[in-house]
Amino acid sequence: MFKQYQFRNYRLKLVILVYLLTTIGILVIGSAEKSFQSQQILGLVLGSAAMLVLSLTDYNILMHLYWPIYGGILLLLILVLTPLGKEVNGAQRWIDLKVITLQPSELAKIMLTLFFAKFLSDRQDRINDIFTVIVSAVLFGIPAFLILKEPDLSTTITIALVFCSMIFVTGF
């Protein structure tokens, strides 16, 4: 599950810049509203833990789980539209987990990119087959529709552009 870690390959400059910008952001938010500062610090701690785990994880393992990942994303997107979803300013885009608030459409951007990379690469030899085109369009359309129902037009457009780019690169 975890790959052999080599510190010399780690982009330390990038990590330092991210922490520097995050610290500046926390200080600016803290000067405007103290109550938000603790939430931002919690986000920094949780984000750092996630960064460490993800940087040590071999992403090829995720590629073997691409169907469960797709199903999980659909489940989260459906949960947003149920009473578990939290509405803010007329948009129901979040799931309130009490400790943090999760926005599944943001996670969907990354996971759908991984899903379609694996899905399309597995079908390289029949990429121009009409059945492959229809299945790909349906698999894209379901989460896109759910995200559009939240409503989150910018995320829908983003994943549509990524999907169209992937389709173009594969040679449809």
Annotate each predicted stretch with a short phrase:
Residues 1-18:
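N-terminal membrane topogenic signal
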Residues 15-172:
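Hydrophobic alpha-helical transmembrane segments of multi-pass inner membrane proteins, especially
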